[in-house]
UniProtKB/Swiss-Prot annotation:
Family: Belongs to the bacterial ribosomal protein bL12 family.
GO cellular component terms given for this protein: cytosolic large ribosomal subunit
Keyword Hydrolase set for record: no
Known role: Forms part of the ribosomal stalk which helps the ribosome interact with GTP-bound translation factors. Is thus essential for accurate translation.
Keywords in alphabetical order: Ribonucleoprotein, Ribosomal protein
InterPro entries assigned to the protein according to its UniProt record, in alphabetical order: Ribosomal_bL12 (IPR000206), Ribosomal_bL12_C (IPR013823), Ribosomal_bL12_C/ClpS-like (IPR014719), Ribosomal_bL12_oligo (IPR008932), Ribosomal_bL12_oligo_N_sf (IPR036235)
Subunit structure: Homodimer. Part of the ribosomal stalk of the 50S ribosomal subunit. Forms a multimeric L10(L12)X complex, where L10 forms an elongated spine to which 2 to 4 L12 dimers bind in a sequential fashion. Binds GTP-bound translation factors.
GO molecular function terms listed in the Swiss-Prot or TrEMBL record: mRNA binding; structural constituent of ribosome
PANTHER family: 39S RIBOSOMAL PROTEIN L12 (PTHR45987), LARGE RIBOSOMAL SUBUNIT PROTEIN BL12M (PTHR45987:SF4)
Name of the protein: Large ribosomal subunit protein bL12
Length: 126
């Protein structure tokens, strides 16, 4: 069996679609029993800063709960917001509830929520 270098792996990941990378991350989480969120928790606030962070959240995840009656309009909005291709955007819309954008500022999250709701989707901020 040939050994793959880190560069070979990085190049392969760079050539994958966003949805394929998401699937890869999920598979790695399952295989190794880890979570991609663990790194975020480690880099989070330290002693005493946690109370302030709980009071004022600065990063939000935009979660689409439903695409409503205008599926095509929502797919177009997803493509504009995320830069995904048609197939990836369609897969994201059809897999609701799904996170559209992660760790965005409150202003950007509100803007994305407004765009998706105008297209007919039901959206939550987490």
């Amino acid at each position: 069996m040939a050994q793959l270098s880190k560069d070979d792996i990085l190049e392969a990941v760079a050539n994958m679609s966003v949805m394929d990378v998401v699937d890869l991350v999920k598979a790695m989480e399952e295989k190794f029993g880890v979570s991609a969120q663990a790194a975020i928790a480690v880099a989070g606030p330290v002693a005493g800063g946690e109370a302030a962070a709980a009071e004022e959240k600065t990063e939000f995840n935009v979660k689409m709960v439903s695409f409503g009656d205008n599926k095509i309009g929502v797919i177009k909005a997803i493509r504009t917001i995320t830069g995904l291709g048609l197939k990836e955007a369609k897969d994201l819309v059809e897999s609701v509830p799904s996170v559209v954008k992660e760790s965005v500022s409150k202003e950007e999250a509100e803007k994305i929520k407004k765009e998706l709701e105008e297209a007919g989707a039901k959206v939550e901020l987490e």
